[in-house]
């Protein structure tokens, strides 16, 4: 979702941008510290401009809060039985911090999550387009 916006992925940018724009006092949005490094790596690889990539991350941090990834989260991910470790870590962080939902375009990756998992469009329809 974040990469859709930062990299202006035209097929998904509008719905993903609406998710980020929804951040407010009523809706707090979080991203894990490990996801920030992944986003930086992917954006830098595509943009090939360190200063631009850093500025995009700075802009992102004005919108979302960063959640730590603890040893407990890593152990929970390892013990989760999930095939994709990165997704398991994200889910463990979200559960540990008692987040209400996970927003992703790849909802099937989180089919084993105890949390509500929704696409950007589902989130916008439920919480923004009232």
Model-inferred region functions:
Residues 30, 67, 118:
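General small-molecule cofactor/ligand-binding pocket signal
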Residues 3, 37-39, 109-111:
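Short, active-site-adjacent cap segments at secondary-structure transitions
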Residues 25-26, 63, 80, 113:
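Structured helix-beta-strand junction loops
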Residues 65-107:
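Active-site neighborhoods of divalent-metal-dependent phosphate/nucleic-acid chemistry enzymes
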Residues 32-33, 104:
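Short beta-strand segments at enzyme active-site cores
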Residues 63, 95-130:
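Acidic, PIN/NYN-like endoribonuclease modules and their adjacent C-terminal/linker elements
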Residues 10-13, 17, 34-74:
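Active-site-proximal, substrate-binding regions of enzyme catalytic domains
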Residues 1-31, 45-52, 112, 121-130:
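Short, well-structured N-terminal submotif of metal-dependent ribonuclease cores
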């Amino acid at each position: 979702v974040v990469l859709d916006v930062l990299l202006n992925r035209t097929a998904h940018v509008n719905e993903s941008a609406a998710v980020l724009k929804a951040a407010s006092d009523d809706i707090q949005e979080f991203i894990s510290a490990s996801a920030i490094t992944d986003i930086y790596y992917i954006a830098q690889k595509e943009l090939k401009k360190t200063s631009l990539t850093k500025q995009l991350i700075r802009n992102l941090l004005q919108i979302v809060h960063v959640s730590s990834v603890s040893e407990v989260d890593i152990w929970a991910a390892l013990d989760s039985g999930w095939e994709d470790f990165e997704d398991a870590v994200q889910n463990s962080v979200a559960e540990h911090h008692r987040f209400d939902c996970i927003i992703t375009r790849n909802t099937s990756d989180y089919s084993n999550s105890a949390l509500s998992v929704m696409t950007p469009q589902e989130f916008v329809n439920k919480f923004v387009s009232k």
